[in-house]
């Protein structure tokens, strides 16, 4: 029915974007200097293009496949996490407990793993959870347009594309994949809100 491939693909996609973007942002903020300038200029360049249009262009160049569609979406989406993680790390670098760790002779690895990342990850995880629904829509959209999954792979976006050819005679071929996407997006959005309330309970109060 396409559920396993669709759900596992979008979860892997969000995890990939999370890792790439967060790593780039943390390195940019912590290293500073020319490294920060280069990474942020690349991010600014990527943001200047419409995301889905750029993803379609990259998928078209690389060739239609689910893996290439996921890589294309990663290329155009990592900047969000890079900029967010960078801003969080820059604030933490000026905090007293990080300065104390530096003065006490803590290594860069120790400071990153024990002082910076534990304070950065909760907000980034909330952001990632909230993005799952949007990424599902974009990945299904690429498959629907022919740039994602290819037959005979069962994936909801591809099933929508194939079902539209039988819309007059068998409308359920489009209804059920579409409803599955809709339901999954709603569930993931609600889950993201619940996760935000757990990891950041002061958000609503603010």
Tell me the role of every PLM-derived stretch.
Residues 1-206:
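Alpha-helical transmembrane segments of integral membrane proteins
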């Amino acid at each position: 029915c396409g559920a396993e491939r669709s759900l596992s693909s979008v979860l892997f996609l969000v995890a990939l974007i999370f890792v790439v973007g967060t790593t780039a942002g943390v390195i940019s903020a912590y290293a500073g200097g020319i490294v920060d300038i280069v990474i942020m200029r690349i991010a600014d360049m990527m943001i200047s293009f419409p995301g889905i249009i750029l993803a379609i262009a990259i998928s078209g160049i690389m060739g239609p496949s689910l893996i290439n569609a996921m890589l294309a979406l990663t290329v155009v989406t990592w900047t969000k996490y890079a900029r967010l993680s960078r801003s969080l790390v820059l604030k933490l670098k000026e905090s007293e407990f990080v300065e104390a760790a530096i003065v006490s002779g803590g290594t860069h690895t120790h400071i990153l793993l024990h002082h910076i990342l534990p304070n950065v990850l909760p907000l980034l995880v909330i952001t990632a959870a909230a993005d799952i629904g949007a990424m599902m829509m974009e990945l299904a959209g690429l498959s629907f347009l022919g740039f994602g999954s290819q037959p005979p792979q069962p994936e909801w976006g591809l099933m929508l594309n194939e079902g539209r050819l039988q819309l007059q005679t068998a409308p359920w071929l489009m209804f059920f994949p579409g409803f599955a996407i809709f339901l999954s997006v709603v569930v993931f959005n609600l889950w993201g809100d619940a996760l935000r309330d757990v990891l950041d309970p002061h958000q609503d109060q603010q």
